[in-house]
Amino acid sequence: MAKEKFDRSKSHVNIGTIGHVDHGKTTLTAAIATVLSKHGGGEAQSYDSIDNAPEEKERGITINTSHIEYETETRHYAHVDCPGHADYVKNMITGAAQMDGAILVVSAADGPMPQTREHILLSRNVGVPYIVVFLNKMDMVDDEELLELVEMEVRDLLSEYDFPGDDVPVIAGSALKALEGDESYEEKILELMAAVDEYIPTPERDTDKPFMMPVEDVFSITGRGTVATGRVERGEVRVGDEVEIVGIKDETSKTTVTGVEMFRKLLDYAEAGDNIGALLRGVAREDIERGQVLAKPATITPHTKFKAEVYVLSKEEGGRHTPFFTNYRPQFYFRTTDVTGVVELPEGTEMVMPGDNVAMDVELIHPIAIEDGTRFSIREGGRTVGSGVVTEIVK
């Protein structure tokens, strides 16, 4: 069977369902797909087909995730749903499923619960920029005032974690009733998706961001100069562009790209996703090394101290068998290189067990080009023992 062509005329947005266990995330996911399929946007999905999420490996971590797609009139959505709480934690920290926005599902009958709070905090830390709220199971709540009370609680909770709680769209409905075909509740699903369409902006594409390429390898070509190779992570670079070499060394240096090659062919420019060799003017072979990045000037800076949200692999995932404490000194793997760093745990956290997630402070022995949202692995002797994301630059 010929593959269907991906329709690029609609803008593409990645979203997911978050919230406390049993509040109806998976049922809502099935309901959205099913209701939209009646309006010509994708395939209907059953609860079971989504709940039996396949196992995936991301940076050596086992994550169960369901990916489904559906369409509204203006957009194509890729939607991720996870069966277990631990899967959400891993997913959000590793960035296995990058979310441009999330639908927070809260049971109107129960109100916000511990994982509701934890998912909001995680969203804030790992950079999920927008949240829309679905108050589920409203058919189980007879009291209009109770519904209003739960809505207020959710708005306050969002504001507590720096989301605009007063402005966030909140839609009440019943995912189960909608999935069963009750028209008044199907209407609520369409209302929810209209809010998602309007409130969650279309993300900036990687190619529109400022240029950055992690350096994987360096070699010199006699008579031509030094070439740095790597995969362009974001933006685009043109022959003649000025770039900075950032990281490892304390000082950032500038150079000009005098040539761009891909598959031994010369190009005028390269963009996000391309594997290239960049010929650099006036750069000696020893002036640049793996682990640095080439970047558009003044867009990323080298740092040694940062705060991070980290998931520590369990023993079953090939992680550590024992806990670690403050002053733990593993390797932090950023993009293409390992750098030793020292961990400081938050006050009141004695130790971190395999399988935990934790906020920590890190100080690296060399500066690395990092910014909020930069992802990294924690390794010991080449074995991955953790995965993290930078939540704040300290120095």
Swiss-Prot record:
tr-type G domain mapped to chain residues: 10-204
GO molecular-function term, one example from the UniProt record: translation elongation factor activity
G5 as annotated region, ranges: 174-176
Primary location group: cytoplasm
Region annotated G4, chain positions: 136-139
Keywords: Cytoplasm, Elongation factor, GTP-binding, Hydrolase, Magnesium, Metal-binding, Nucleotide-binding, Protein biosynthesis
Binding site residues for Mg(2+): T26
Positions contributing to GTP binding: 19-26, 81-85, 136-139
Entry EC no(s): 3.6.5.3
Region G2, annotated ranges: 60-64
UniProt signal peptide: none
Entry GO CC: cytosol
Compartment list: Cytoplasm
Keyword Iron-sulfur in record: no
HAMAP family documented for this protein: EF_Tu_B
Function according to Swiss-Prot or TrEMBL: GTP hydrolase that promotes the GTP-dependent binding of aminoacyl-tRNA to the A-site of ribosomes during protein biosynthesis.
Subunit structure: Monomer.
Protein's recorded name: Elongation factor Tu
Organism: Enterococcus faecalis (strain ATCC 700802 / V583)
